Design a protein with these regions (language model features):
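C-terminal motif of bacterial Sec signal peptides marking the signal peptidase cleavage site
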Residues: 17-21
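A residue-level marker of the well-folded mature domains of exported/periplasmic proteins
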Residues: 3-5, 22-326
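Bacterial N-terminal signal peptides that target proteins for export
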Residues: 1-11
């Protein structure tokens, strides 16, 4: 194992150790909005952020606070630190929010079966619920806002197919089933003639394991020239594996989200492209739709905020657009 990889894994380990002990909490308003200051019946929203340390979810936090402040609504966000999902931490914070009588809840039910009972309890207390980026994985919410993963998977396949020559894809995902399969199955169902999936490997959703998983895939399937992962936290491992295997310029990552690591990878030649999800738009629309629900208005059960496929060709333009949006 290289010194560079050892350092990156140490950082990941530190993030995991501190995960259970710390949280991120912020409020866009010191107290619940009064009837005079709020345009709606809704006075407070709790946002259970799954990964506030991840750059795009940090953007969602920022835009959530901006939108709730604009509307005079108390907006509080909490979530674990580090870059590894901690469902139990988030579930505990949702339980607290229910006990504190928040008017509405925004959440990302990564493990739907664990979240559904809490959603039912929240609804029984009169809370409105918006889920983000998980489609119809749960049933009790009033509405869902975020990326349509089926559409995203098809778009990724089409963009890989625009590369010249045969594209042999190795997929890296957390596990079989779940939200990842929605993207992957759509990807597989829309493969252009020059794109073939040669292998699928699992890293357990642990970014400290991705580099080894990626290197093993490249060793077992040397014909691979694309490593595709929907996991935003897999980027560093994919880029490191490509470098350590001496495959820069021969193998390229196709990943998710537009984080600083992804930008560096695109500019450095380890990442071909990424799906930029619109996290700011997600957060703001979720707030606005919850307000509409509280006013008795009809809202769509799902709202697709779309993705933009980003390569070196449009990177600077998309970065400028992202800066303006947030």
């Amino acid at each position: 194992m290289s010194v560079r990889r050892s350092a990156s894994l140490a950082v990941a380990a530190i993030g995991f150790v501190t995960l259970a002990a710390c949280s991120s909490s912020s409020s866009s308003s010191g107290s619940p909005g009064s009837a005079a200051s709020s345009p709606a019946k809704l006075k407070s929203i709790f946002f259970a952020n799954p990964l506030p340390a991840y750059p795009d979810w940090a953007t969602a936090d920022k835009c959530f606070k901006s939108e709730t402040a604009k509307l005079g609504i108390k907006g509080v966000t909490q979530g674990p630190t580090g870059l590894q999902i901690n469902d139990q931490f988030v579930l505990d914070r949702i339980s607290q929010a229910i006990a504190q009588n928040y008017g509405a809840l925004m959440a990302v039910p990564i493990t739907p079966s664990a979240y559904e009972p809490l959603f039912q309890r929240a609804k029984s207390k009169g809370m409105e619920i918006a889920t983000l980026n998980t489609g119809t994985a749960t049933k009790t919410q009033n509405l869902e806002v975020g990326t349509d993963y089926g559409t995203q998977g098809a778009k990724v396949a089409a963009n890989i197919g625009r590369r010249p020559g045969q594209q042999n894809v190795g997929i890296i995902t957390n596990q079989a089933g779940g939200i990842g399969d929605v993207i992957i199955n759509a990807f597989k169902s829309h493969l252009p003639a020059n794109v073939k999936v040669v292998a699928t490997a699992f890293d357990g959703g642990d970014p400290s394991k991705t580099v080894d998983v990626a290197e093993q895939l490249l060793t077992a399937h040397p014909e691979t020239n694309i490593l595709f992962s929907w996991e935003g936290t897999a980027v560093a491992g994919i880029s490191t594996a490509i470098k350590e295997k001496g495959k820069v310029g021969k193998v390229f990552g196709v990943v998710n989200d537009l984080t600083p690591q992804v930008v560096d990878g695109i500019r450095g030649g380890t990442i071909y492209g990424t799906s930029r999800q619109h996290f700011c738009d997600m957060a703001k629309k979720a707030v606005d739709l919850l307000v509409a629900v509280s006013q008795g208005k009809q809202v769509p059960p799902t709202t697709d905020t779309g993705t933009t496929f980003v390569t070196k060709a449009n990177l600077d333009a998309v970065l400028a657009e992202a800066k303006d949006e947030s």
